[in-house]
Regions:
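Conserved small/polar residues in nucleotide/adenosyl-binding loops
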Residues: 232-234
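Charged, low-complexity surface segments at secondary-structure and domain boundaries
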Residues: 4-5, 15-19, 60-64, 121-128, ...
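An N-terminal domain-start capping segment
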Residues: 2-17, 66-95, 162-182
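Phosphate-binding site of ATP-dependent enzymes
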Residues: 106, 132-228
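Phosphate-binding glycine-rich loops and adjacent basic patches that engage nucleotide phosphates
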Residues: 14-16, 32-43, 98-100, 200-212
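Charged, low-complexity, helix/coiled-coil-prone segments
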Residues: 9-25, 47, 79, 181-199
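Membrane-proximal basic amphipathic "stem/tether" segments
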Residues: 1-61
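A conserved helix-loop-beta module that forms one wall/lid of the active-site cleft
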Residues: 46-129, 139-157
């Protein structure tokens, strides 16, 4: 089936089209957004598929109660309250703008990201090697990110109204010595029960996604990223 991605090859153009359409009512926008991604129209009256149910929730669920979970800074307090400290990467600072960052106070290795979005991670492995051009590139990237309303793109209410920051965390190495970065585990819950998970590897280089059931049986599921060609040590 045709999708917006298959018809419009340029990602910037696709994003521009969706930005132009943001003024339309949420149910219509969500239906167009779903079609653009899947090539099918969602059944928002009687949702059956997982993705349809997520779209239904955007319209009918009080998503504002999840806002602090979507905020990568505030969720740290929630996690600490529920299971104790020691489970989060140490945070080194947060700033309302890139120009507020005191790079002299940061270690040689650290990670930058925004708290209100997805995909804004920058891994700094050698601070001393950063050139003026590198700093300017980071400045443009994060100033642009801090202006983005992440709610508007997919109409996910949990992102609406988050106070935006760029923040730094301690760089963490994989105990196995994998230079591609630490493994990233994500779980997919259906009706409140975890059924599927994926492990992301090589985050710092060429990310791979591998899906498993809850008994760690490898599943033949692909996302936008390829599967790993080597055995994953869980």
């Amino acid at each position: 089936m045709a999708t917006l991605k298959s018809v419009v090859k340029s990602r910037d153009t696709r994003n521009f089209i969706m930005r132009v359409l943001r003024f339309i009512p949420t149910p219509i926008y969500i239906s167009l957004y779903y079609w653009a991604a899947t090539g099918k129209w969602p059944d928002l009256k009687h949702p059956t598929y997982f993705n349809e149910k997520l779209q239904w929730m955007k319209i009918h669920e009080d998503y504002t109660k999840y806002r602090d979970y979507a905020d990568k800074i505030k969720v740290r307090d929630i996690i600490e309250e529920k299971i104790g400290d020691g489970y989060m990467f140490p945070m080194l600072g947060k700033w309302k703008s890139f120009d507020e960052i005191d790079f002299d106070s940061l270690p040689e290795e650290f990670v930058l990201k925004c708290n209100h979005d997805s995909g804004s991670v920058k891994v700094i492995r050698n601070k001393s090697a950063l050139t003026d051009k590198d700093i300017e590139s980071l400045r443009k990237f994060y100033n642009s990110r801090l202006k983005q309303d992440f709610y508007g793109h997919g109409r996910e209410p949990c992102y609406k109204g988050i106070d935006r920051y760029v923040f730094a965390e301690k760089f963490m190495k994989d105990p196995s010595g994998d230079e591609g970065g630490i493994k990233d585990y994500k779980f997919f819950c259906f009706n409140g029960k975890p059924e599927i998970m994926f492990i992301a590897t090589d985050r710092a280089t060429d990310v791979k996604f591998d899906f498993f059931d809850m008994d760690f049986n490898h599943l033949d599921i692909t996302n936008i990223h390829p599967q790993s060609l080597s055995l994953i040590h869980i």
